């Protein structure tokens, strides 16, 4: 039974940092439930506003429907009571509905609707896809605007008018004109979150567009640094943001961009670099090379991001 109504969930999520926990795998690439539970317990010990299980960073695209449900269930059970867990819905409409209903059965508070896999969609098709998911669950639904799932402003407005449990718009395109049209049409009926890869890079300018939060992949392995960065963004401390970008985030991007798919792989490389192993990634992704991990370890050390600690009163 969800503790948050859809609107209460939106109000909660928009005022804090969000993250997508990596899904731990064993050497045979089966889900490592023990390591995953430990990871969720560690992540939820920080003042993060919400954790999205089986999302992009959690390799939800590589999980079966059954694994998606189990991973979400484990996250709900392991998370601190103060930190809501949301599920992720992906694939075909039928699969996305199964994911959403599985998340609700697991006790999740909401669901993120990811783009359908490898299919072209027009506006009406995307409306029907999102509408079917909204109708299938009482949980709050957030759509992810990215890749082949570019929701027109008119579709977002229709969804927000028709479905009270449609609560959020996550953008992974960075199209400012598109975002401006949506925020103008929908206003504070929805909450808006940044979903570009390594979202810290864009967080400060997007704050001016009404995006008060974003999904932080690096929270997986340097949560103190990620929360400090978010605090600087919300305070609009441009000097502090630029310093952190220069010291860590931009060099981190250089490592991430060495190979396609490293946006997910580097998170597990980061966990390994800080002594927390969530295993490798499933194909078709590939793991960071040993040199990549060594370079990331050096960057974490020289930038101070790996040893950064929040003041106790902030972390409590």
Swiss-Prot record:
Q: Which SUPFAM superfamilies does the record associate with it?
A: Aldolase (SSF51569)
Q: What is its EC number?
A: 4.2.1.41
The protein in question is named Probable 5-dehydro-4-deoxyglucarate dehydratase
Q: Which UniProt keywords apply?
A: Lyase
Q: Return one Gene Ontology term, BP aspect.
A: D-glucarate catabolic process
State the InterPro entries in the record.
Aldolase_TIM, DapA-like, Dehydro-deoxyglucarate_dehyd
Output the Gene Ontology terms for molecular function. 4-hydroxy-tetrahydrodipicolinate synthase activity; 5-dehydro-4-deoxyglucarate dehydratase activity
Pfam families reported for this sequence: DHDPS (PF00701)
Instruction: State which pathway it belongs to.
Output: Carbohydrate acid metabolism; D-glucarate degradation; 2,5-dioxopentanoate from D-glucarate: step 2/2
Ranked from the top, the taxonomy reads: Bacteria, Bacillati, Actinomycetota, Actinomycetes, Mycobacteriales
PANTHER family xrefs: 5-DEHYDRO-4-DEOXYGLUCARATE DEHYDRATASE 2-RELATED, DIHYDRODIPICOLINATE SYNTHASE
Name the SMART domains on file. DHDPS
Question: What family is this protein classified in?
Answer: Belongs to the DapA family.
Which chemical reaction does it catalyze? 5-dehydro-4-deoxy-D-glucarate + H(+) = 2,5-dioxopentanoate + CO2 + H2O
Q: Which HAMAP family match?
A: KDGDH
């Amino acid at each position: 039974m969800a503790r948050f109504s859809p609107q209460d969930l939106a109000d909660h999520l928009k005022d804090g940092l969000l993250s997508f926990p990596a899904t731990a795998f064993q050497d045979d690439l089966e889900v490592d439930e023990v390591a995953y539970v430990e990871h969720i317990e560690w992540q939820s010990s920080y003042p993060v506003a919400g954790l999205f299980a089986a999302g992009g960073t959690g390799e939800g695209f590589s999980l079966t429907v059954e694994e998606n449900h189990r991973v979400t269930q484990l996250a709900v059970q392991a998370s601190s009571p103060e930190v809501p867990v949301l599920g992720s819905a992906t694939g075909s409409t039928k699969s996305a509905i199964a994911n959403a209903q599985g998340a609700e059965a697991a006790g999740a508070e909401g669901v993120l609707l990811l783009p359908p896999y490898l299919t072209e969609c027009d506006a009406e098709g995307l409306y029907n896809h999102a509408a079917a998911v909204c109708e299938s669950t009482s949980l709050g639904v957030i759509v992810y605007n990215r890749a082949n799932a570019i929701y027109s402003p008119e579709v977002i407005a229709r969804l927000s008018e028709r479905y009270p449990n449609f609560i959020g718009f996550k953008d992974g395109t960075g199209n400012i004109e598109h975002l401006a049209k949506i925020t103008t049409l929908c206003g504070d009926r929805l909450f808006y979150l940044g979903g570009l890869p390594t979202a810290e890079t864009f967080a400060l300018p997007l704050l001016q567009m009404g995006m008060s939060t974003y999904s932080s992949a690096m929270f997986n392995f340097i949560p103190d640094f990620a929360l400090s960065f978010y605090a600087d963004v919300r305070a609009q401390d441009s000097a502090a943001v630029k310093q952190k970008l220069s010291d860590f985030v931009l060099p981190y991007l250089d490592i991430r961009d060495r190979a396609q798919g490293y946006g997910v792989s580097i998170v597990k490389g980061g966990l390994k670099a800080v002594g927390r192993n969530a295993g490798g990634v499933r194909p078709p992704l590939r793991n960071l090379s040993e040199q990549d991990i060594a370079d990331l370890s050096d960057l974490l050390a020289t930038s101070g991001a790996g040893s950064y600690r929040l003041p106790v009163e902030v972390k409590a």
